[in-house]
Amino acid sequence: MHELHTQRRVEFADTDMARIVHFSRFFDFMEAAEHEFLRTALGDGRQVHFEYEGHEIGWPRGRVSCEYKSPARLGDLLDIRVSVARKGTKSITYRFDFSLDGQAVAHGEITAICCRVGGPKLEAIAIPPFLADRIEEAPAATAR
């Protein structure tokens, strides 16, 4: 799996006083879409944070960014395309393309690092095979 399409309705709580989406909300939208991507890739009822070899696994962020192209407003139904821009042994970089009626709204990226999170400090680990085998990088034309 290298891509997922989903949608998100802009709610009142997502907007600022001008009734456009507050810039910070796009990071919430990206995280929700990432979680949907991972749940779909896992396909077995597991949640994004799961146990593997006796340890809790989580996905802290190494890098996030978002570039805004045009405003989204209260009530808009955003189309969100999530694609895997890069899959390393210990991290995944997702690309998020937001659009409204075919017009670009924003583009973002998240690099999530696979880590053991239950102990006193985070430890980056290889993405477990049962997940790594289900995720692949998007073709170059798709990931941009």
Predicted stretch roles:
Residues M1-L77, A85-R144:
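Terminal targeting signals and extreme-terminal segments of soluble enzymes
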